[in-house]
Amino acid sequence: MLTAFTRAFKTPDLRRKLLFTLAIVLIFRMGSHVPVPGVSYTAVQNCIKNADSTTGVLGLANLFSGGALLQLSIFALGIMPYITASIIVQLLTVVIPRFEALKKEGQQGQTKMTQYTRYLTIGLAILQSSTLITFAQNPSALFGPSCTSILPNDSIPTLVIMVLTMTAGTGVVMWLGELITDKGIGNGMSLLIFTSIASTFPGSLWAIQQQDGRWDIFIGVILLGFLIIALVVFVEQSQRRIPVQYAKRQVGRQMYGGTSTYIPLKVNMAGVIPVIFASSLLALPSLLAQFNRSTTGDQAGWVTWIEQHLVRGDHPIYMITYIALILFFTFFYVSITFNPTEVADNMKRYGGFIPGIRAGRPTAEYLDYVLTRITVPGAIYLGLISLIPLIALVLVGANQNFPFGGTSILIIVGVGLETVKQIESQLQQRHYEGFLR
């Protein structure tokens, strides 16, 4: 592997891409520590130091921003508005015929869809930054009751400048991600999420060691993390390959077809999206409870019930609800991203068939049958990966947004594998051996 890294940096154009990617990542991480105008940096740091563990409402977003959210930096929103916009646009392709038509138009349609995603990202950034500033006016909702004030001046012009700065920061982050995709290595947006999550690892691990002062627990957590990573790598690489044969056909004097290939159906077809959906949906009751919390101490019954059962991840009701949502969203997302009927029609159009299965409707039914059978273990796997770290780390006083949680590991492994494969293909094009042998 070290030889492969050396060869990658010895190849001029590949070295240029790698250094460009590292430079953009460095700019992104630097921007994550620059506070927006109107925020007291000293007060924010003191509040973070004495903060309660952030769970539910803002924990996931703070994790994806590499801690920039709670620091109220210019990149506080990170890549979350873009992720949300991409998911919404992808879901709308099923509902709106215009979007479905654009999806089938190839590169031109994809460019138009990307443009819509950018517009929606800016709209969501305005909404999310306004919400964050509202929380910042009452910082106890962000950092706990020990924090009372982080905005020396909360006049309307100052708040507007803060919202515009965070929205502009989201636009810059989106541009940086696209620069990496165009001129660097890997998918830019994915790499920015990767670096955001990875940047929280050292601090979170050290916090566990400092909390108990026991090195055996610290080493145990690290070993558990490596074990989970190994399991995720194994499952993410697992796939069911359905053989496809193409019939020979003659065009003029040329003979085409007669080749064989396969349709790869991954065990985890949905990726990390169901976990994000489930985490976001499960955060809504906690958000409602926070806004309806009584200042006199006499809480409504439903607010007390939510705070007892749906805020901390160590409660059985929270865990059961969480895994049920993950199972539902896994089947839902796979059903809208992989259409067996469309795949069968495309195969029939180009003369392809699955050996032993008739073309057309029987092929679609067979693909649907295989997809359902492979999605069941995939959904269970997502649920277990999300719950096992939760159960284990609650025992050492961590919260469900700890970096070794299911969401973090799935993203880090997925992005890492994708980036390594891209570097691998670049090396093999130049007749070098890559990382994967």
Each model region followed by its residue ranges:
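N-terminal cationic and glycine-rich segments that engage phosphates or anionic surfaces
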Residues: M1-K103, Q107-R437
